[in-house]
Amino acid sequence: QPGDQIYIKDGQYKDMQLKWTGKGTEKASIKIEALNPGKVKIEGGSTLRIAGEWMSVSGLHFTDGYAPKGSVVEFRNGQELANHCRLTNCVIDGFNPSRRDQAYSYILLYGRHNRVDHCSLTGKLNLGVTLIVILNDERCLENHHQIDHNYFGERPVYGSNGAETMRVGTSQQAYSSSNTVIENNLFERCSGEVEVISIKSSDNVIRNNILLECEGVVALRHGDRNTVNNNLFIGNGLRNTGGIRVVNAGHQIYDNTLVGLAGTRFFSALGVMDAVPNSLPNRYCQVVD
């Protein structure tokens, strides 16, 4: 019910398929919290599904496990999506399957007006983007999600595409507005592939983030009118540390600081891509405006 606050006692919870749905309100959200943050361990073959309105989940620690089906955390339960929901103060650490080529994400964001904040997402070794903003449903467009104050920890080079740390949309949604804000996060040694943050939609904001020794770039890969400002890129001279790669039209890129980046070509500090004549949305459209 609106205003309910549910506490989970300390302990190890194994092979849990958690499905939490509810209908809170802006003034009376439903809160599900660890009694002592970090001491509720979710282990084994476990997943979490959040759906409904004005739900908040905090203090969980996913460790020593894997997602047996789907991704670890999804902001939906079946066809019911989450709106105005929040995942905060949670940890997902080394939650990998036995096979590196088994693909899944740590977090899938569906719905609208959801927030992921003050979380630690580390130790991802398998194929699959760490966090994806899903746009393949009209109920997910113009979502105004907030992804802020998180720690994205070390992710080693995977060796192929599909190992981004974050992706917003796909080429099919290039000209759809996502309106996602990615701000005040720390990305440390997120080197799964060349695109650390892959923007494949329009009207997003990436600001006030730190990318520390990441072998990759913030890629405005598809879509228009994205803003990248006041970010700090620190490479410390390490191979393939990069900055910002630009494709498409109408972007605003300003007040970023790029220090000690050693990447070249697709890993450059600033790459403005050549266009493909009469390009399809999933290729390389001209950089203009």
Where are these regions (language model features)?
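Beta-solenoid repeat scaffold
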Residues: P2-K41, L48-G59, E80-C85
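Glycine- and acidic/polar-rich repeat regions and solenoidal domains
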Residues: Q17-L18, G44-R49, T63-C85, D93-D289
